[in-house]
Amino acid sequence: MFKTINKSITSILLFMISCYQKWFSPFFGPRCRFIPSCSSYGYEAITRHGPWKGGWLTLRRLSRCHPLTPCGCDPVPD
């Protein structure tokens, strides 16, 4: 049952990120200071690590994406 809940949460999160990438991101233009972009990072993190750890990694990444942080490459950890 827990596995089914994880899959459902993963699907919902990935759907939300995909909607953002398709419908909202084109209006805002490139804003992220990192490579890959925060939405791509979140999609990859949730796909690789599941909704809980991947979601936490995504939140940490989003908290670092601001003008006072230096730009650069920040891949999803293994």
From Swiss-Prot:
Family matches, as InterPro entries: Membr_insert_effic_factor_YidD (IPR002696)
The record describes its membrane topology as: Peripheral membrane protein
Keywords on record:
Cell inner membrane, Cell membrane, Membrane
Task: Tell me which Pfam families the record gives.
Answer: YidD
What is the annotated localization of this protein?
Answer: Cell inner membrane
Q: Name one GO cellular component term.
A: plasma membrane
Q: Which domain of life is it from?
A: Bacteria
What is the documented function of this protein? Could be involved in insertion of integral membrane proteins into the membrane.
Q: Which family does it belong to?
A: Belongs to the UPF0161 family.
User: What is the protein name stated in its UniProt record?
Assistant: Putative membrane protein insertion efficiency factor
Organism of provenance: Prochlorococcus marinus subsp. pastoris (strain CCMP1986 / NIES-2087 / MED4)
